[in-house]
């Protein structure tokens, strides 16, 4: 694992990579748990860094389509010699159907095909038919995106009022990665109390970062807006009851 910094939105940079001897790099933009995205120029710098050193670059672009104030860039804008992973799970809301795709450099297609066939033959026929149909659901999918956007705005407006002042830039996806160091040094204990007492489910940062994750929690806003508003009120009550909020 490459240690990233809050300064760079928890995304790797060539400077970060220079400290490691690596043969491959996996990036995610938008990412989970932060929701942050790599800007176009830094992404190009990563592509060039890897190309110059013959480092295989794998770009997880599964959350493409779910973004707010900035447009995502793909590594294919800068090179054909990268691997791109994508899926119907997130933007197309087909998580349980287990279907996606990968873009591979032409000379590696057969290699990747053999690896894939050793794990499974193909996605189920039903999943493939539904995936084709998903392309016709643009209106519904954009409505989902508007719901995420509204939920995001409600949370970004409310959470600082409860003392959550340090949140990773939620450029895309549907997560907030929140610093709780002012309240706790044990993210698991914090989210357990939030669930048991407040009735709101969050994810402890240690699930994503065993070194620095005890000061972070992840919150998902991929629900209906009334549910998010209900959750905001519950968080407020919890923070007051636990004396975190005066």
Where are these regions (language model features)?
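Active-site PLP attachment segment
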Residues: 78-111, 215
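Hydrophobic residues in well-ordered beta-strands that form the structural core
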Residues: 1, 57-59, 86, 202-204
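Structural signature of PLP-dependent enzymes
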Residues: 112-119, 134-157
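Helix C-cap/helix->beta junction micro-motif
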Residues: 52-53, 162, 198, 242
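Active-site phosphate-binding strand-loop segment of PLP-dependent enzymes
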Residues: 4-69
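Active-site C-terminal subdomain of aminotransferase-like
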Residues: 107-127
């Amino acid at each position: 694992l490459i240690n990233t910094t809050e300064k760079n939105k928890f995304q790797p940079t060539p400077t970060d990579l220079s400290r490691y001897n690596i043969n491959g790099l996996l990036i995610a933009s938008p990412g989970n748990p932060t929701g942050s995205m790599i800007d176009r120029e830094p992404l190009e710098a990563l592509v060039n860094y890897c190309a110059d050193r013959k480092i295989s670059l794998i770009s997880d672009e599964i959350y493409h389509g779910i973004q707010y104030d900035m447009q995502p860039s793909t590594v294919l804008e800068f090179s054909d010699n990268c691997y791109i992973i994508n899926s119907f799970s997130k933007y197309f809301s087909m998580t349980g159907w287990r279907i996606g795709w990968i873009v591979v450099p032409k000379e590696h297609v057969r290699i990747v095909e053999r690896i894939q066939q050793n794990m499974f033959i193909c996605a189920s026929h039903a999943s493939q038919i539904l995936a084709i149909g998903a392309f016709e659901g643009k209106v519904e999918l954009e409505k989902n995106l508007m719901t995420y956007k509204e939920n995001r705005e409600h949370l970004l407006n409310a959470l600082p009022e409860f003392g959550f002042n340090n949140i990773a830039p939620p450029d895309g996806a549907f997560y907030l990665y929140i610093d709780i160091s002012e309240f706790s040094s044990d993210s698991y204990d914090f989210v357990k109390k939030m669930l048991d007492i407040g009735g709101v489910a969050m994810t402890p940062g240690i699930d994503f970062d065993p070194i620095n994750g005890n000061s972070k929690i992840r919150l998902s806003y991929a629900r209906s807006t009334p549910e998010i508003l209900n959750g905001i009120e519950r968080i407020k009550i919890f923070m007051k009851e636990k004396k975190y909020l005066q």
